Structures are given as structure tokens and as C-alpha cells.
């Protein structure tokens, strides 16, 4: 069973996110630093009648990287071709996609860190000089074919920027770090979603829901759907702060946005290792989760909220973690 606080996409959420997707930067809530920079770069590219420099968007899942890619294409007034790293298995797959691009188009590659190296190497000349050299045939009859490409913009999205090779990363002229959303921005997103789907919600309820959504719009919208169910069955259909608190408590989402897995991580560190330091591998074994899952899905939010710290010796539970779970904390 999936966690309700999982920031990866679930079920019909892709369709829901397309419905909610803003079209232009002025409609995009949050990520102001990235938006402000992109606004300037896009306007400058349009004034020069050039393709926008290649863009790398990185950050945790669910923060709007795909949405931002579509917004960029809309702002430029061009078509967007969407694919993902795992789908492009060989160089020929990429060549077929590149051949379909029109001048100025946007090619969006999600999970770009998962591109095979053989495919990535084809991208280098395509990104830098808008051409590719490919080998046709095999053995003695093989020959090299030079293909010119129209100027285009590659937008790469990744949750693991550190896994990108240096040559690929260096070819992105624009980088945007997508960060967890501020409480006020997330509250506005919840209210916008409720309005689009004609849900009646109070501002206090939207604020409480945003507070417990881990700074992530995808999670906020998922929780909103579940709280709506509670409001229909246990109330009069109106989503207020009382029904929101009751629903999220029943869903094991506390006031800091932690669920049972997050709490299990913290309790394990405190009860079994006196708060740490404890190695990530050891911690993963104790909570029966993959090391990568802990590192990518759970740890970033716990660090961002100040519940754990990374040290040279391992992970350490903070005084805030002790206090939140009701343990007595003493300085080491």
C-alpha cells in the first residue's frame, strides 16, 4: 500500500495534475526565484528570435518540474515534446525524437539522470551545435551520417542532479532549483484546487492542510481529495478546520506533516541508537526500507524540517525530534 505522503505520482494523479496545470508564469504559484529568472530569459530569447538556452530543473518529486516545462513552452509559444530517461533506451530512440522537432520547439526529458550513457553522448552535439552524427549499418558496410537539427530547447528534469555527468550538466545554460513550497503558497494552491473542482473549503482548513503537506503541491492535492471524502461522509460537505484535523489524524498525518514511516525512523534513531549518529544503511535495515528510499523519499523532508542532521559519523536526531515525539532530550 502506498503512503499517502508519497511525493511520487499515484493512480489518476497525472490526469488531475494536467487539469490543474497553469498555462503561464503569472499563473504559477510559488517558486518565485525560478520564475523571475525564467521570465527574463524567455523574454530575451523571444526578442532575439532565438531558441531559449537549455534548462535543467532539479528538486524533489511533486514540486512542479513538469508543470514548469509546459509553462516555459507556452510562454515561448512553441510545441513541447515529452519523454523520459528510462524510455530512451538507445541512441536511435533519441534520434527519432530529435528529428520530429521544429525550430524553437521544447524537448522535455523527465528523469534525465536515467539516460544511458550511449544516449547521453548523442545529446552533447545536439545541445551544443544542433547536429548529430550517427552510424548507419554494421561492420564494413557501416557509414556515418551527419544530421543538422533545428535550434531547440532541451528541458531536463531530475530529482538527483548529482547523478548527472559533468559534460551533460555543463551544457545547460539555465538551472532552476525547485524548492519545497512556503506555507502561504501551498495554502493558495489548495484553495485554487478546491475552486477548480468546486469544493467548499475554509481558509483555516486550507492553511491546516497546507501545513501538513510537506511543502509539496502533489501531496496537498492528494490530501485535499481525501479530506473531501471525510467532509461528505462525516460532515455537511464543507471542508473546515475541524474535519480537516480529524481526517488527517485518521490518515496518520501529524501537524508537522510526518506519517508513521517518518516517526518510525525518528523513534528507531532515538530508542535503539540514543539519537545517533547512525549510518544510513543500518537505519534502512532497521525500518525495513531500501537505502535509496530512505535517502530520497524520507530524509530530505526530515532534514529540511530540522528533525535530523547529517554528520560525518551518520544521522543524528535533533532536540526537535525528541520534543515532537515526547521524549526527554539531553545534550551529548
Swiss-Prot record:
- Disulfide cross-links: none
Cite the residue spans of the region called Small ATPAse domain (RuvB-S): 182-252
One Gene Ontology term, aspect cellular component:
Holliday junction resolvase complex
Query: Where does it live in the cell?
Result: Cytoplasm
The answer to whether keyword Repeat applies is no
Q: Where is this region: Head domain (RuvB-H)?
A: 255-332
- Give the residues the record marks as binding Mg(2+): 66
In this chain, the stretch annotated as Large ATPase domain (RuvB-L) covers: 1-181
User: Catalyzes what?
Assistant: ATP + H2O = ADP + phosphate + H(+)
Q: Which InterPro entries match?
A: AAA+_ATPase, AAA_lid_4, DNA_helicase_Holl-junc_RuvB, P-loop_NTPase, RuvB-like_N, RuvB_C, WH-like_DNA-bd_sf, WH_DNA-bd_sf
Q: What is its main location?
A: cytoplasm
* Enzyme Commission code(s) on record: 3.6.4.-
Query: Keyword set for this entry?
Result: ATP-binding, Cytoplasm, DNA damage, DNA recombination, DNA repair, DNA-binding, Hydrolase, Nucleotide-binding
Q: Write out the domain note.
A: Has 3 domains, the large (RuvB-L) and small ATPase (RuvB-S) domains and the C-terminal head (RuvB-H) domain. The head domain binds DNA, while the ATPase domains jointly bind ATP, ADP or are empty depending on the state of the subunit in the translocation cycle. During a single DNA translocation step the structure of each domain remains the same, but their relative positions change.
Looking up HAMAP family in the UniProt record yields: DNA_HJ_migration_RuvB
Entries under NCBIfam families matching the protein: PRK00080.1, ruvB
Q: Describe the task this protein carries out.
A: The RuvA-RuvB-RuvC complex processes Holliday junction (HJ) DNA during genetic recombination and DNA repair, while the RuvA-RuvB complex plays an important role in the rescue of blocked DNA replication forks via replication fork reversal (RFR). RuvA specifically binds to HJ cruciform DNA, conferring on it an open structure. The RuvB hexamer acts as an ATP-dependent pump, pulling dsDNA into and through the RuvAB complex. RuvB forms 2 homohexamers on either side of HJ DNA bound by 1 or 2 RuvA tetramers; 4 subunits per hexamer contact DNA at a time.
Family from the record: Belongs to the RuvB family.
Q: What is the protein's given name?
A: Holliday junction branch migration complex subunit RuvB
Q: Which organism is it from?
A: Streptococcus pneumoniae serotype 2 (strain D39 / NCTC 7466)
The opening ranks of the lineage are: Bacteria, Bacillati, Bacillota, Bacilli, Lactobacillales
